[in-house]
Amino acid sequence: MNAHNYNYVESVGILEDSKKYTEKEHLVSKKILCKDYNDAVILPPKADYAGKRNGNWGKGGVVDSEGNFIVASTYVGDWATQGGFYEYNHVDKIIDDDVVYIGFISGHYGHFLVDCTTKLWPLVNMKKLGKNVKVAYTGDNELNGNAKMIINLLGINDEDLLYIDEVTKFRKVYVPEQSAKPGEWYTREYLKVFETIQENIKQRAEVHSEIKRKVYFTRTGYLDAKKKEVGEKTLEKVFAYNNFEIYNPERLSIVDMMEIINESTEVACINGTIPLNMIFSYNKNVKLIVLNKTGVYHRNLEYFAEICNFRIIYVDVYDKKFKAKDLGVGPFIVTVTDNLRNYFLDNGMKIPNETKTFKYKDYCTFLILLANRSVRDKLRPVKNKLKEILHK
């Protein structure tokens, strides 16, 4: 039975999709392997313009000493895919080290959490691989920020992280299989990754048991949000009026963010990447209020909620006249809806009398963003075709 609260949600699609998801078993007893290959080569990512457009992160991966591509070095998710052999003239670099290859690391933090954590499971117990084994990865850029800190929280030091941006041969390469496929299945090895991170955060974070906080994590500080989201400042104000502390998560380390969450009774945020961070919290009693910016089901959030056992209260805050058809691209407009008013009323919270549901400036901004997206959508096939021609 679904433990999440949908009393403040109107989308029939969300309700039906959630029901379908909870009817399936996602924890599997699948045996996953981490095989090693002597004198193996790591190929950095190379754009694959012949492949599908969305979610294709290019070719690349691991090739054994005989030139055979190692299929386990690819990634197949529910949306994103990465990996595949391509011809190369020579090896650019030879490093006399043993490494474990954790795959392609996306520069998008949400995709890092969902897609790029599936091959981290050998890092939980590196001793099994042997002494002085380092961690190799490819990706958009070198690891930084909270993505790197999450790897550090598995016991990996910065000096043992090797970013591969050219064809590189190693003494030995360990290649782990995926421990999960987002939204579809996961193994106990995958679960252990997050349990380990939770425990290490618990050891680092300062927790003041006497503090009982209510917090709202806002997206208004994200540059990307400013390009596609309108109206959240109004939501900030109504939550602040009810004694919620307002935080910008992009200014917090993952340890600091969990320190805040772990001593909170209530956490509120817009649906998207922010609530995915709850997978690192050991506070299972927190009331998580997720504000829907559209009527599209976020399967990966419920997938993470299942893995680490947290419950969600969903509240619609989008204008039904302008609801987006996706979770990421938008544009989105959020406001004080009847569903939010009902949630506040049912929970002894108040909305300031002067709060305006309709703001002319917000709607004008939204319509401009909507027009911009329409133009981009029309130009995208031309842009992709041009890229394909230039890279032939």
What are the residue ranges of the model-derived segments?
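The feature primarily captures lumenal catalytic ectodomains
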Residues: 1-390
